[in-house]
């Protein structure tokens, strides 16, 4: 699959774990989590230090989520990504997105290689906000990325 097909397939799933969503309501991870909910996704928070996020049960690890999710957005530091990728594989999660806007984000090459070696679908980098339809700052960002030829096809 092309990168764009992987992104579209990920976003076509309805039940998605958001791994690394913060307890801090002002954190960017919460904005991302809330946007998935606003768009009708069943977003499942994963944070080992939170029993709930915005009234929804939070799980300590991907493998504890019940019922299972179809995909996982990983928004943790890259140093945690390989262990989280292994948890996702053990939990039967076949689609993972390692978030990155600037810097390294959650992208770790060992984690990406692990997932790909297991036949999992991987989006390594990028921000889901750029691929949600509609106006806004991230729509403008997506437009600019298209202009410079770096938008996935």
Predicted regions and their residues:
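NAD(P)-binding Rossmann-fold cofactor-contacting core
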Residues: 22-26, 30-54
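Mid-chain, well-packed structural core segment of small domains
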Residues: 69-105, 109
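A short helix->loop->beta-strand "cap" motif at the edges of active sites that frequently abuts
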Residues: 41, 91-96, 118-120
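Rossmann-fold NAD(P)-binding glycine/threonine-rich loop
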Residues: 101-129
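Short N-terminal or domain-adjacent regulatory/targeting segments
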Residues: 1-12
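A charged, well-structured terminal subsegment
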Residues: 131-153
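Conserved beta-strand elements of the Class I
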Residues: 17-19
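Mobile, glycine- and charge-enriched loop segments
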Residues: 49, 54-77
